[in-house]
Amino acid sequence: MEDYRAQFIDIYNKNVTRPGADRLLKWLEGTDFFTAPASTKFHGACECGLVMHSINVYNAMMQHFFTEGEDNPETFAVCALLHDVCKANFYKVSTRNVKNDATGQWEKVPFYQVADQLPYGHGEKSVYLIEHFMRLKTDEAIAST
């Protein structure tokens, strides 16, 4: 299994250098950001899915949209890596009963459930959380919503 946490931190530390970036990363490390899913049913609905999704968005943005000498690498890293920070501490693992087709027995299986502690709009919540630690440019805030 890839070490998505190390990949994320490497990209983040190389690109995100503005005041407060270190405090934001420390906060992320105190949450489940690096182990949480990105969703309950769709993309990244697995352990570490959130950090994996964030890295995938970063790689896609850099490959398809970044122009060296024109674009700001920090802005791309901030927008891609942090667009879903609102999903940190957003899911919890619960269990439900599912019938095993082979045995006919009911079994408890884990699944991800939303446990929203801060009911705020999805993109707006990411901006709100980021801004606790570091300032965003207007275009970064808009791109994250």
Feature map (PLM): residue ranges:
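Divalent metal-dependent catalytic cores for phosphoryl transfer on phosphate-bearing substrates
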Residues: 38-46, 52, 59, 63-145
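Non-catalytic interface/linker regions that flank or bridge core catalytic/transmembrane domains
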Residues: 1-36
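All-alpha helical catalytic cores of prenyl diphosphate-utilizing isoprenoid enzymes
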Residues: 23-30, 43-55
